[in-house]
From Swiss-Prot:
Three calcium ions are usually bound at the interface of each cadherin domain and rigidify the connections, imparting a strong curvature to the full-length ectodomain. Residues 1-21 form the signal peptide. It is a single-pass type I membrane protein. InterPro entries: Cadherin, Cadherin-like_dom, Cadherin-like_sf. It comes from Mus musculus (Mouse). Residues 668-788 are annotated as: Ectodomain G. It is found in: Cell membrane. Glycans are attached at N519, N604, N724. GO terms for molecular function: calcium ion binding. This is Cadherin-16. Residues 22-788 are extracellular. Kidney specific. Residues 27-128, 133-237, 244-338, 343-451, 457-566, 571-667 form the Cadherin domain.
Length: 830
């Protein structure tokens, strides 16, 4: 029993060091359980304030009045005291609170928290959970693997020596074959076979062992409380037998989970554990029945390796795990799948039969080597045409190789090949898939270009057509499809040795233009036959070009006849209204009178005033100009036709100005000084002035107008152009006029008056400086033309006489040489 005096002394010492009467945060103290001394038991000096007479101390606990009855506060000493014995197993800790309160309940000091711990004493005896333990032990159990766990408890404080339990085997009955067949873990109470007991267990068939076991507290100390129990162990035969492989059909239609095998561990306290490699839908129940929980798919996993373990409650294996092989049996549940391939295959046209164009293959996920994965190929399309003896494609049913048949293919064709892949070796019940590939027949340059027309023309061209003119356009065609194979080249093969013609075309064009390169000549060649050939730029495959690769262009050269042209584009003259019938007004002539003969006619002589001579082109008044008024104009159209070629014609207008009849005779002005013009014609003329010397005429207002006299020869040979309001310009109309002296009549109009000038012009040959060269008279002593001719004729007669004598002599000499020898007379020698 512990005396209270030392505790009081201890608490007094603590209190001596307390200088402040303030509550501490929390006070902790320890009180031994089962205290056997006097009570009250002084536990702790509380830090109560001095002068606490004004209030009273209040003690409260966490269990209301029960704790208050167990503890109290000595008001005189200020100690916390225990009023009775404490039992740790009843309560190990008390939470107390001390306050100083006034009469009206007001807290003057506190609260002060105090925790009282009850110190444990070894006053509890260990107890087994059972007085007798029974267990079954299977042969083949590994040594050291617990097959039974003994359980015991101690009411003392956990974690202390008072509750630190140790297990021991006190005895084994029977002790055969070895007295230490078993081992017991002293800390855990795990009962297992000892290594020596494991080897001897097979000799103890159906034996029962009884063990006397003890549990003691205070750990390994010799002192302490203890308890005893009995363990009865039955030895049973080992039923942990190997398993045969299990074959399961894939996609098996049964109720799941479906049992496939069973294991059994004959020992007690067994827990079965299942492992699958790879993980699969398998489990095992508490009875050791193995199940598959769902349908299996051989293509996903064809085989599983299962391990079944028999374990104790702590997950330790009693024996080596059992292996179970699960083989998934194949079913024909997978159709062939076409292997990836290029969806389009290009094959050149003209490829020989037997050329492989594609190899279609399929894969079947069913078991390799089984009928379920035995694939046979069948050609679905294109189907051969009815009545056709040849096929475009051939198919190897085993390899899926597609080759060209004997039926020809054409460039540009797009053919969809459909091949059926059937498993079960092509059986009707087999699964199938359709493999497709598009065959594109590519073009080769096997067609030579050809002209659409091999004969063109005849094309008529005038010989004066200018170089560069288009002669003909030749169209060609090429049956090939590839643009590069349709590119053409053109050339002139024959018929143009002089290079008169040329070809032009665009690089990608299918037509060529035959153009003129040089001038044509009717005299040199009135016709041409030009042969043009067309060919491919790319190399031709197969037969060469045929006859249609050439085209012949026939060209006819047309002689050019110069168009009709009059010496003037229009004719104009002025006549008085009093001009009598039959008067010559003017003459219409061709520009080149010596080249052709014309026939003239009037087209629109509405008044019938005029007439024209058909051959000479002279225009006369057909009747009096009745109705004509001065100042009026009268226009007619003259048509000229070629006498030899009536189809050639031309026309010109004739404008007649009517003048007022002069009441007085026409005033003839004296000619001025002589003037000359050069022939052939040069670019200058004679200025004619219209200003009259008559003051009455000269003083009138208005411009002067000029016209040649009505003589046709004058109008043919001369041309008069106005120079200004008072002068005109006279030039030669013809390129050549016979040299001589000419009086050119010029009619002048001024206001209402008219008069005529006689302009004297000398036409002569001129030197390079434009100066007139005049004829000189015959010089004395010079021979005349007649004498010169006589001398020439006499000379020629003399030469002719001499030549006659020479030729006569030569003829006689040749005759003498031709006589035979016997005809020559003998000459006597003298």
């Amino acid at each position: 029993m512990i005396s209270a005096r030392p505790w009081l002394l201890y608490l007094s010492v603590i209190q001596a060091f307390t200088t402040e009467a303030q509550p501490a945060e929390s006070l902790h103290t320890e009180v031994p359980e089962n205290y056997g001394g006097n009570f009250p038991f002084y536990i702790l000096k509380l830090p109560l304030p001095l002068g606490r007479d004004e209030g009273h101390i209040v003690l409260s606990g966490d269990s209301n009045t029960a704790d208050q009855n167990t503890f109290a506060v000595d008001t005189d000493s200020g100690f916390l005291v225990a009023t009775r014995t404490l039992d740790r197993e009843e309560k190990a800790e008390y939470q107390l609170q001390v306050t100083l309160e006034s009469e009206d309940g007001r807290i003057l000091w506190g609260p002060q928290l105090v925790t009282v711990h009850v110190k444990d004493e070894n006053d509890q005896v260990p107890q087994f959970s059972q007085a007798i333990y029974r267990a079954q032990l299977s042969q083949g159990t590994r040594p050291g693997v617990p097959f039974l766990f003994l359980e015991a408890s101690d009411g003392d404080a956990p974690g202390t020596a008072n509750s630190d339990l140790r297990f021991h085997i006190l005895s084994q009955s029977p002790p055969q074959p070895l007295p230490d067949m078993f081992q017991l873990d002293p800390h855990l109470g795990a009962l297992a076979l000892s290594p020596s007991g494991s080897t001897s267990l097979d000799h103890a068939l159906e034996e029962t062992y009884q063990l006397l076991v003890q549990v003691k507290d205070m750990g390994d100390q010799p002192s302490g409380h203890q308890a005893i129990a009995t363990v009865e162990i039955s030895i049973v035969e080992n039923s942990w037998a190997p398993l045969e492989p299990v074959h399961l059909a894939e996609n098996l239609k049964v109720v799941y989970p479906h049992s496939i095998a069973q294991v059994h561990w004959s020992g007690g306290d067994v827990h079965y554990q299942l492992e699958s490699q790879p993980p699969g839908p398998f489990d095992v129940d508490t009875e050791g029945m193995l199940h598959v929980t769902m349908e299996l798919d051989r293509e996903a996993q064809a085989e599983y390796q299962l391990q079944v373990r028999a374990q104790n409650s702590h997950g330790e294996d009693y024996a080596e795990p059992l292996e179970l092989q699960v083989v998934v049996m194949d079913e024909n549940d997978n159709a062939p799948v076409c292997s990836p391939h290029d969806p389009t295959v290009n094959i050149p046209e003209l490829s020989p039969p037997g050329t492989e164009i594609a190899r279609l293959s399929a894969e079947d996920l069913d078991a390799p080597g089984s009928p379920n994965s035995h694939i046979v190929y069948q050609l679905l399309s294109p189907e051969p045409e009815e009545g056709a003896e040849n096929k475009a494609f051939e198919l190897d049913p085993t390899s899926g190789s597609v080759t060209l048949g004997t039926a020809p293919l054409h460039a540009g064709q797009s053919i969809l090949l459909q091949v059926l892949a059937v498993d079960l070796a092509g059986s009707e019940s087999g699964l199938s898939s359709t493999c497709e590939v598009t065959v594109m027949v590519t073009d080769v340059n096997n067609h030579a270009p050809e002209f659409i027309n091999s004969q063109i023309g005849p094309v008529t061209l005038p010989e004066d057509v200018k170089p560069g003119a288009l002669v003909a356009t030749l169209m060609a065609t090429d049956a090939d499809l590839e643009p590069a194979f349709r590119l053409m080249d053109f050339a002139i093969e024959e018929g143009d040795p002089e290079g008169i013609f040329d070809l032009s075309w665009e690089p990608d064009s299918d037509h060529v233009q035959l153009r003129l390169r040089k001038n044509l000549s009717y005299e040199a060649a009135p016709d041409h036959k030009v042969v043009v050939v067309v060919s491919n730029i790319e190399e031709l495959v197969g037969p060469g070009p045929g006859p249609a690769a050439t085209a012949t262009v026939t060209i006819l050269v047309e002689r050019v006849v110069a168009p009709l042209k009059l010496d003037q584009e229009s004719y104009e003259t002025s006549i008085p209204v009093s001009t009598p019938a039959g008067s010559l007004l003017l003459t219409i002539q061709p520009s080149d009178p010596m080249s052709r003969t014309l026939r003239f006619s009037l087209v629109n002589d509405s008044e019938g005033w005029l007439c024209i001579k058909e051959v000479s082109g002279e225009v006369h008044t057909a009747q009096s100009l009745q109705g004509a008024q001065p100042g009026d104009t009268y226009t007619v159209l003259v048509e000229a036709q070629d006498t030899d070629k009536p189809g050639l014609s031309t026309s010109a207008t004739v404008v007649i100005h009517f003048l007022k009849a002069s009441p007085v005779p026409a005033l003839t002005l004296s000619a001025g000084p002589s003037r000359h013009l050069c022939t052939p014609r040069q670019d200058y003329g004679v200025v004619v002035s219209g200003v009259s010397e008559d003051p009455d005429l000269a003083n009138r207002n208005g411009p002067y107008s000029f016209a040649l006299g009505p003589n046709p020869t004058v109008q043919r040979d001369w041309r008069l152009q106005p120079l200004n309001d008072s002068h005109a310009y006279l030039t030669l109309a013809l390129h050549w006029v016979e040299p001589g002296e000419y009086m050119v009549p010029v009619v002048v109009h001024h206001d209402t008056h008219m008069w005529q000038l006689q302009v004297k012009v000398i036409v002569c040959r001129c030197n390079v400086e434009g100066q007139c060269m005049r004829k000189v008279g015959r010089m004395k002593g010079m021979p005349t033309k007649l004498s010169a001719v006589g001398v020439l004729l006499g000379t020629l007669a003399a030469i002719g006489f001499i030549l006659i004598l020479v030729f006569t002599h030569l003829a006689l000499a040749r005759k003498d040489l031709d006589q035979p020898a016997d005809s020559v007379p003998l000459k006597a020698a003298v």
